[in-house]
Amino acid sequence: GSDSDISEATNIEDYFDDNSINKSKYKRDLSVDRKLIGLEQMLWIKNNLNKKFKWSIIGQQVLMAQVYLPTIFANMNKKILPDYLHKYLKIGGVNVPFNTDAWDGYPKERERLFKELKKADSVLVLTGDTHNSWLNNLYDENNNFIGVEIGTPAISSPNTIDTFGSLTDGIEEGFIKENKNVKWTEGKHKGYTLLKLTKDKSEVSFVYVNTVKSKVYEVIDTNKFNVKPNTPII
C-alpha cells in the first residue's frame, strides 16, 4: 500500500487526538538520509496537529527520548553476558547513542518531528516494544520542552531483569541518574499501562502482574504518575 495507508487517527470525545505511526515499513529498508517514519507520515502530522485538543497522543514503537547507557555498563563483566551485549559495554557512560534503530539513530528527523509537535497543546508519546517501563521528558536540541513519553512494559518480551538479573536495580538507577530525560524506568516486571485523560491531567498507571503465562493472574504492583498539560515530569 501507499504511505498514506500507514497513519491512523481517532478523535475521542472533544479533547483527545490519537495519532498512530507505523514504523515497520521503513525499518526494513533504511535509506542513507535515515528516515524513520518517512515524508508522507511527517506531512500528515504537519497537517493534522493543532491546539484544538487538550492532549495530542502519538502512538509509536521505539524510544523517542534521547537515552544513553549509564556507566554501570562499562563496569560489567562481559563473561557473564551473552556475546551480543559485549559491544554495549564500551559505551557505558560515554553519552553516545546505543540504540540507533530508535529515534536516537534519526536525530534530524526527530527534530523535524518535534517542530511539528510544538503545534499541539500538550503531547503524550505512547511507546511500545522497548521491553521496559519508561517515563521520559522530551526536549528538542534547543532544550525546549516538547512533551512526555510513556513507555509501556513488556508482556512476553524479555525485560531488563530477564537479561541482567541482579544488575537490574543498578541499571535502572543509572538510567535515571545519568539521563536528564529519563524521569523513571522499571525493568523487573511484566504488565501493561493504563492512561486516564482529563482536561486537567493525564493519570498514567503502570500495572504489573504476577504471571503472563496464564489467563488467571493477579496485579502485584502499580506505579502511578500524574502528567499536567504541557508540563515536564519533575
Annotate each predicted stretch with a short phrase.
Residues 1-234:
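Metal-dependent phosphoester/phosphodiester hydrolase catalytic core
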